[in-house]
Design a protein with these regions (language model features):
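Histidine-centered active-site/metal-ligand motif
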Residues: 27, 252, 335
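Short, well-ordered turn and helix-capping elements at secondary-structure junctions
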Residues: 243-245, 322, 340
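Single conserved hydrophobic/aromatic residue that forms the stacking wall/gate
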Residues: 334-345
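Short FAD-binding loop at a beta-strand-to-alpha-helix junction that anchors the flavin cofactor
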Residues: 328-333
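Contiguous C-terminal substrate-recognition/catalytic subdomains in enzyme active sites
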Residues: 78, 203-313
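N-terminal Rossmann-like NAD(P) cofactor-binding subdomain of oxidoreductases
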Residues: 1-207, 237-238, 281-285, 293-294, ...
């Protein structure tokens, strides 16, 4: 790509915004031009605005330390300086919806990590390897918003970015009929570190607000189809989920039990995973994993501590595939799929 796009981060001081800062450092396609946050941070240098809250494992890039943080609510000021923004604000959903639409109506495309617009019928919720074709809904969204260039696209919830990619290559030939999913989600998914979440030490919390509903509903939008001016959800598979917060810093784990319309052999499943390539791989996107799905043969893998950084944290790690007494198969998965890890860019 010859052109370098100017990008901004709206919500730059939070944990998700910090992750964007690290991922965009030295990115060949994008130049980080604007950092925006709440009015409390506006006018400060990024280093001062973040202060002791820098939560990444790598140091804050020198290139952003002295950048002046802008007020995210001053939409025109931010939008006029960038080609598009990544949005990672922490606000009530109605306020996020309004803010993201304001940026889109200012002809500034929005790529959002937030959940506010995930079920807006004409907003694509995209996992590039799964449903890149859903971006074709954008002209219909632009018509509704009255924009020529602006639009909103969102990423899916963190809990499903391991098991949906693992099931997807099996859908066409075998048909997934139902799945039971238990997720064991790292504290970074809550935007926390251990020193900011002492209640998780030596503990498991068997509830994450809203997470189970998202884990059951959002895959159906990802597997849905465009019909007119909206995305229509798929009718199956039926998914039931239980979500736990566990004392792990990064990397969500999932235990998945799955049944098929036509039961595959174990060898067919392994072959489907090994051969799967999505648009992100075909386009050779800078941060896309070369091999999206990795299968581990060891009986005690995958593990978050050992495997979460496979392919720079962008791969899905699968293991322990075996037949089940109630479902056809059961398996384990690991992915750094928390909100601080966006899709390949």
């Amino acid at each position: 790509m010859e052109r370098q796009y100017k990008v901004g981060i709206v919500g730059a001081t939070g944990m998700v915004g910090q992750r964007f800062v690290t991922l965009l450092e030295n990115h060949p396609w994008f130049k980080l031009t604007v950092l925006a946050a709440s009015g409390r941070s506006a006018g400060k240098s990024y280093e001062d605005a973040v202060g002791s809250r820098w939560a990444m494992t790598t140091p804050m890039p020198e290139s952003v330390k002295k950048m002046t943080v802008l007020d995210a609510s001053k939409v025109e000021e931010v939008a006029s300086q960038v080609d598009f923004v990544f949005c990672a604000v922490n606000m009530p959903k109605d306020e996020i919806k309004a803010l993201e639409e304001a940026y889109a109506k200012a002809e500034c495309p929005v790529v959002s990590n937030n959940s506010a617009h995930r079920f807006t019928p004409d907003v694509p919720m995209v996992v590039p390897e799964i449903n890149a074709d859903h971006i074709e809904i954008i002209p219909a969204q632009r018509k509704r918003l009255g924009t020529k260039r602006g639009f909103i696209a969102v990423k899916s919830n963190c809990s499903l970015q391991s098991y949906v990619p693992a099931l997807h290559p099996l859908m066409k030939d075998f048909g997934v009929s139902k799945a039971l999913v238990c997720t064991y989600q790292a504290i970074s998914g809550a935007g926390k570190t251990f020193d900011r979440m002492p209640e998780i030490v030596d503990n498991v919390i068997p509830y994450i607000g809203g997470e189970e509903e998202k884990s059951e509903r959002e895959p159906l939008k990802l597997w849905g189809h465009i019909e007119g001016d909206q995305i229509v959800n798929a009718e199956k598979p039926v998914i039931t989920a239980q979500c736990f917060r566990v004392p792990v810093s990064d990397g969500h784990t999932a235990a998945v039990f799955v049944s098929f319309d036509k039961k595959p052999t174990k060898e067919q499943m392994l072959e489907a995973w090994a051969n799967f390539r999505g648009p992100a791989q075909e386009l050779n996107l800078p941060s896309a994993p070369k091999q999206f799905l990795h299968y581990f043969t060891e009986p005690d893998r995958p593990q978050p501590k050992l495997d979460r950084n496979t392919e720079n944290g962008m791969a899905v790690c699968i293991g322990r595939l075996r037949e089940d007494t109630l479902f056809d198969y059961k398996l384990s998965l690991i992915h750094i799929s928390e909100p601080t890890r966006p899709e390949p860019i």
